[in-house]
Each structure stands twice: as structure tokens, then as C-alpha cells.
Amino acid sequence: NGIWRGGTSINIDSPLGIGDRVYFSYMTVHKKKADRSWKRTTESLKPGEILPIGPKGYDPVKDTLPYKRELDLYNFRYTMKFRDYTLSLGSSRSENISSFYTPTTIYDMETMSSNFSVNLDKILWRNQKSKLSLGVGLKRKHNKSYIEDTLLSDRILTIGDISLNGTTVFYGGIFGITLDYERGLRALGASNTPKAEFKKYSLNLNYYKPLTKKLVYRFNTLTSHSKDVLYASEKQSIGGVGSVPGYHRRGNIMGDRAIEIENELSYKIIDSEKIGRLSPYISYSYGAVRNNKNPSVYGKGYVSGASIGLRYSMKYLDVDLAYAKALSHSSYIKPRDREIYFSTSLKIRF
């Protein structure tokens, strides 16, 4: 069974005539509605009554209650450039409802996340081949989760961020590096727990190298390190589309310390302005995580996977189809035998 996602996005160049840009996107999934009219709250029970486990006539041995799934993702970003500075404002919101089973019944969980960010980047130095920039930013994250109508968590994080970014020409390719430091702050209503005042370091390296006119190699690695026990939202997550292939539905891992390495070879079969660009590709990725103060078997893990796919792009259309296979992984991870990834986008310009 697959999960189909659909959405739309809008890019507006220079809406104020000052070289700025506005971006908005919305994404959702095929929703699975389920009748929950049989459910009751504990407050509505009379003395001696117990909560029902299903609708009238339900048998937990023979019957299966329907799963509920809803997901809505909203994202907004505004950027403005002035000389060597770039100001970025961002806002996003996600609303997710899913279900989990127990031996006798089913429960629905709802999570809501609202994020706001502001970033300022300055180009420190550049020439025809290289560029170095410094960025500072502030993020506010508000996460709520419920099981049925019971509040499970309500957390606000405020995060300060400073990063150093560089790109240069290296052995006929383009090499990029980003060093990043994040710190949880007591500001803007943030939680005052020790976990909310974390420190985290990240390093991203990427390399793009045309080996011939048609053969291209891409390399990307992302590693993060923290001595603190992080909230799940701040851990580095590995597995699935855009990460280690083969673990999108099952087998995602996350950790306070993590590394992910991605390699890809692509070959341009067609490269035409009229017809478009067609490129088959093959990729291999590896990822590993470790969680602080967690000595159990689930405290660390690793995954590796490969994919083979085909990309097609033209002026108004992008298509990507890939077959993904999980390779080696930690013993407790149970991925699917294979996964198929498909995405397409229609571009309309005014």
C-alpha cells in the first residue's frame, strides 16, 4: 500500500520590485476518514460504565477497526536581498492525525506543529570561483500532541543559530561546506526544561562533479553532534525519500549524534531545450545514529540502501520515478522488501 501526496506551490519573483521573492506551498495526503461516533470520553460515563472498545457488535478477535489518516502541510517563505545581505522570513504549519492499534481497540493521535524563523546572511568574501558567507537566525517551534482528547505534550522551543557557508570550484566540480551551531534559548515563551536548552553542531559537505559531458557524480554528507538528549524534533532523522532509500515506510532512525552519506551517478540520455532532459541514475546511501543516555539496543542503529531511477524535466514538467531497496541495517529494523518512489510536478509561469 502506498501513500500518495498532492500539493501546490507558488513562487512570486520581486512582488515589491526590490529583488525579493515570495514562496508558498501546501501539501496533503489521501485522507482516510473513519467513523469514531462510538467513542466516548471518561467524563460522559455513568457509574459502572466502561469505555467502549469499538462499535456495537465489534469483535477484537475477528474484526479490524478502520485506520485514520490526515495530513496537511503549509509553508511560507519571504526573501529579500540588499547588497551583500539576504533577509529570510519563514513560517510553516503541519497538522497530522494517525492511528495506532492495541490488542483490543484503536486510538487516534493528533499532532500540530507551528514554526517561525528569521535569518540574515551576509557575503563575507567572493570572487569568480568561490564564496564565503555568514548567517545568523532565530527559530520558534510550537508542538502539541493529543491522544484522543487528552493533551500529551505542549512544547515551545526557541533556537538561536549561526552558520558559516562556503562554495568553491574544486577539481573541475563544485564543492560546498556548511558549519552550523544551534542553541536552545529561554526566550519567546520557550520551555525551561534542560532539554530545551540544548547545544548542537552540524556539518554538511556536498560535491557536484561532471565526469564527462553526460555522466555526473553527486556526493552529500550531513553529520550532527550533541552531548544533550534532544527532543525528537531536533534529532537528525535518516531514511526514506531524500535520504537513505528503502526506509520510507519502515525503519527510519534518528539520533543525537548522526551521520548520513549519499552518493549518486546520473547519465544524461537526452539534453534538449525543446524535448527536455532525461537522466537515469543510481544511488547508494548509508546512515548511522547514536542516542545519548540510551544503553538499549534501540539507542543506536544504522541503515544502508540503494535506488535506481529515472528523471525527466522540461520547462513545464518534472517527473522522478525510482525503485528503492534496503540493504544492510540494524537487527531491530524491519524495512519493506522494496519501495517505489514517484513524484511529478507541473509548472505554470505567468
Which residues are covered by each model-predicted region?
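Outer-membrane beta-barrel "beta-signal"
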Residues: L310-L317, D337-F350
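Hydrophobic, lipid-facing positions within transmembrane beta-strands of outer-membrane proteins
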Residues: W4-I10, D72-F76, S114-V118, T158-L164, ...
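Repeated loop/turn-to-beta-strand initiation elements of outer-membrane beta-barrel proteins
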Residues: L16-V22, R83-L89, R126-L132, F170-F175, ...
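Transmembrane beta-barrel strands of outer-membrane/channel proteins
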Residues: T8, V22-T28, L89-E95, L134-H142, ...
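C-terminal outer-membrane beta-barrel translocator/porin domains of Gram-negative envelope proteins
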Residues: K144-R277, I282-Y286, R290-N292, Y332-K334, ...
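Outer-membrane beta-barrel initiation region
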Residues: N1-G90, R126
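Extracellular loop and loop/strand-boundary signature of outer-membrane beta-barrel proteins
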Residues: V29-K32, R36-R40, I50, D59-T64, ...
